[in-house]
């Protein structure tokens, strides 16, 4: 039986259900690697009717034999990470397989304060940041002024590394944003304490991954957020500060592209977005409320109500292209169960012309009007279906329509939050690379 190293990415604006899909695939993985992002992302896993909400720790932590590595491309809030570890321990989940890259950057208290202050100052130009300090952490990383996990393990080095940044950030907080300064000694002592608790999990990320590759272990790379939030390829400036696309796995984990065998994109059967920015298929009124309520569309990280809309095939095809998707996992199909008809965006109208590509300008994107095709609904429950043939004919037709529109086959269909509410057409890790559910 062949094995594969797989990247799991979000094919929309995040919140697609990657946590469940990664959890499902983690059962077949030897190593699960989170390669970018921080506590601005979140995923929800349901185990034995228990809802576990994680922001930093990969879903694979639920499997004792699986190594879960938080890679160099991530930014770590140690306070949040330790809370997650404590929550897992309280639920009798073994955390010995968790490993943390020594070179991952650390979100400091001043990053969070600056993030909130800068977003507030933007006023009407706000971008919808989560306020968790992710952008300022990545900014310090780019300016070569950041703190890394390895710095938390050495008192002298941390004091030296923080001397300049703390002075600079306190000056910014006080003089520019009117925020009380931080107590430098208190910050240093607090983060040295975090370092002591995290020390048993800290490893050389590159050595860990490549040792696994040499041993022919299969590796699952887990992205956070989604394609349209990518810093370089998303709806800029309404994006995150890292690269959630599949190429980000190479940089954030420290591997070459030849190590990756397949890329699976996760997309909801409709579309959601949190925060600001254009959203051509966004719904208002009763259908929006219905999707939000049935889908439980509230952010894991922010608790904000998500904006809901019809499935957008234009951004879907874009996600296929920029990620090199081999197959799709379609989630929350069951949320559409009660609708008598379902619309799918197949193109946009921009300045009176039909376009089938994603505009690079946010201003142009905001002027796009969706061109829809309408399909019949199935108006019966799908949550109990476990095989493709159990699905209503119109639900199968809808999935085939999406596969044809996206020009990529569907490997997995999710019909609820629980693990068993899933139809696996083919295991992307163990199965042969062939056409799955397609038109």
From Swiss-Prot:
Residues annotated for IMP binding in this entry: 15-18, 40-43, 130, 144, 225, 240, 304
UniProt main location, coarse: cytoplasm
Compartment annotation: Cytoplasm
Reactions this protein catalyses: IMP + L-aspartate + GTP = N(6)-(1,2-dicarboxyethyl)-AMP + GDP + phosphate + 2 H(+)
Pathway linked to the protein: Purine metabolism; AMP biosynthesis via de novo pathway; AMP from IMP: step 1/2
Chain residues that bind substrate: 300-306
Biological process terms in GO annotation: 'de novo' AMP biosynthetic process; IMP metabolic process
EC number from the UniProt entry: 6.3.4.4
Cofactors named for this entry: Mg(2+)
Annotated family: Belongs to the adenylosuccinate synthetase family.
Assembly and binders: Homodimer.
Protein name: Adenylosuccinate synthetase
